């Protein structure tokens, strides 16, 4: 289930982003970025619609996914065809 980031309290959104970064050990390229820099990059992707906050009922967990990849996977799981 996609969670609209606009409906989250600012502190909640910040905590989700930080949790995902710390859990995933996200790689941002050759130069290592600070936690704050990583958070700002991920928040920008969320606000620009590039990334989605997703709740998994199966795993009872929250994650942040690339929008295109998430929608492809959802379509694949539902056996639908993308236009």
Swiss-Prot record:
<comment type="similarity">
    <text>Belongs to the UPF0270 family.</text>
</comment>
<dbReference type="InterPro" id="IPR010648">
    <property type="entry name" value="UPF0270"/>
</dbReference>
<protein>
    <recommendedName>
        <fullName>UPF0270 protein HI_0956</fullName>
    </recommendedName>
</protein>
<dbReference type="InterPro" id="IPR036685">
    <property type="entry name" value="YehU-like_sf"/>
</dbReference>
<dbReference type="Pfam" id="PF06794">
    <property type="entry name" value="UPF0270"/>
</dbReference>
């Amino acid at each position: 289930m996609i969670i609209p980031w606009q409906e989250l309290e600012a502190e909640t959104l910040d905590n989700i982003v930080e949790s995902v970064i710390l859990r995933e050990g996200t790689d941002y390229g050759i130069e290592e970025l600070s936690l704050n820099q990583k958070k700002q990059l991920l928040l920008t992707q969320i606000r620009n619609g590039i990334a989605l906050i997703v709740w998994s009922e199966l795993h009872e967990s929250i994650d942040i996914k690339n929008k295109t990849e998430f929608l492809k996977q959802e379509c694949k799981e539902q056996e639908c065809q993308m236009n």
